Regions:
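Short aromatic-hydrophobic micro-motifs that form the base-stacking/packing surface
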Residues: 91-93
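Small-residue hinge/turn detector
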Residues: 78-89
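Glycosyltransferase-associated regions of secretory-pathway enzymes
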Residues: 1-77, 95-302
Length: 302
């Protein structure tokens, strides 16, 4: 069945990762409405832009100031979804959620576990005025801006689900969180593709865990390595804006390990190193052959 999914964006541009996620919903026949403060924001064809200020004035947006996630607008996004769902109801998805199927059932409410401990809020469905959302909104407003990562997100939703004895409604992690956040980099590791494909075989959606990618300094402007699960989806739902491709120095595609270390290079390059692979927001292709995507990359000082 066709559904319309709602989300929220702060900023003047989206990366190819967000575009890929939105495009996946459109390609599966669903609607996608993005609330933002820029009416000229470039988004994939078929995405409907809506005025976010009708839900939350821009001057009330805020980011985490300290700790894990510092600089992220995730807390503001949590508040926004509670305001939106309390008022209008419907589907909510974060901008780092991929749609994997056109076949999504009708729910009277939807929330799913990310693991045995927490309910995640990246994918939600509620009718307007649902008590669970009203209580999340009330507590989020009372806590204000001085919150830490997850405090008004998964932790708050989990707390309210328990207090209202609604744990029986929680869907299994396999519906939307088949890849746990601790294994997020498996999505861009060609060695893990079969394992990820098996985990997602019966999933409706896939959460990409954007903050894990951000903490690992994975550029969202570079195509994932060829052969990885995320690259397979990027090829299936093509979008514009990719500025590079992750490759090994010998020209072969990179297998992403779990460890990330910095390379001491000029500050203007901001280059990271993963197992001998130079990665950067400033990578650009020097040459592209007609066979596949064998780009040779260099650091651009422009």
């Amino acid at each position: 069945m066709r559904h319309t999914f709602q989300s929220f964006w702060i900023g003047d541009r989206i990366s190819p990762y967000e575009a890929l996620c939105m495009r996946s919903f459109i390609d599966h026949g669903h609607g996608f409405a993005l609330y933002c403060y820029n009416s000229r924001l470039k988004v994939p064809r078929g995405v409907e832009l809506r005025d976010a200020s009708t839900i939350l004035p821009k001057d009330q947006c805020f980011a985490y100031s300290t700790g894990f996630g510092a600089g992220s607008f995730s807390a503001c996004s949590n508040l926004f979804r509670y305001l939106l769902l309390q008022r209008f109801g419907g589907w909510w998805v974060d901008t780092d959620v991929l749609c994997l199927t056109h076949c999504i059932p009708i729910y009277y409410s939807f929330f799913a576990r990310e693991d045995d401990d927490f309910i995640n809020g990246a994918v939600l469905y509620f009718e307007p005025g649902d008590r669970l959302i009203e209580e999340c909104l009330r507590d989020a407003l009372n806590l204000g801006r001085n919150v830490v990562w997850g405090q008004i997100g998964p932790r708050l939703i989990t707390q309210k689900v328990q207090e209202l004895n609604r744990g029986w409604e929680a869907q299994p992690a396999s519906t939307c969180y088949p890849v746990h956040w601790s294994a997020a980099l498996d999505l861009v590791d060609p060695r893990k593709t079969a394992e990820v494909a098996s985990s997602t075989a019966n999933s409706m959606m896939l959460h990409l865990w954007n903050e894990i990618f951000r903490q690992a300094a994975i550029s969202k402007k570079c195509l994932p390595p060829r052969g990885s699960y995320l690259r397979m989806l990027a090829d299936r739902h093509p979008v514009a804006g990719w500025r590079g491709l992750y490759l090994l120095n010998d020209g072969s595609d990179v297998c992403m390990p779990s460890a990330l270390t910095k390379v001491r290079l000029p500050a203007r390059d901001r280059v990271k190193c993963i197992a001998g692979t130079l990665l950067s927001n400033r990578l650009r292709p020097l040459r592209t052959s007609t066979a596949g995507d064998r780009h040779i990359m260099q650091v651009s000082n422009n």
